[in-house]
């Protein structure tokens, strides 16, 4: 599974990273681990999954985490987009 995380601000990509998850974990564990890896690389707290994030991810294999998902942390960008590239 390949997962892409990118940080966007004012319709411009500031940073991106691709994570490859080849472990025998469940799909859900791979997704959560990839999000942790991406956030750790940028020294961010791991965002919480709101209902809209879960719904978008289930439907489109992509979601955006905005300021409301980063509890107790002020972010310097508009959103973190998280997307499955290949399963």
Describe the residue ranges of each PLM region.
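Short, extreme N-terminal segment that most often corresponds to the first beta-strand
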Residues: 1-18
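General helical secondary-structure elements
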Residues: 8, 26, 57-60
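Generic structural motif
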Residues: 10, 22, 85-87
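Short, flexible N-terminal segments of the mature chain
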Residues: 13-41
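Acidic, low-complexity intrinsically disordered segments
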Residues: 34-87
């Amino acid at each position: 599974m390949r997962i892409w995380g990118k940080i966007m601000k004012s319709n411009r990509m500031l940073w991106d990273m691709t994570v490859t998850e080849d472990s025998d974990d469940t799909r859900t564990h791979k997704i959560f681990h990839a999000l942790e890896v991406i956030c750790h690389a940028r020294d961010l707290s791991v965002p919480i999954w709101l209902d809209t994030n879960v719904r978008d991810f289930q439907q489109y294999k992509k979601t955006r985490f905005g300021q409301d998902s980063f509890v107790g942390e002020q972010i310097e960008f508009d959103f973190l987009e998280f997307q499955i590239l290949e399963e």
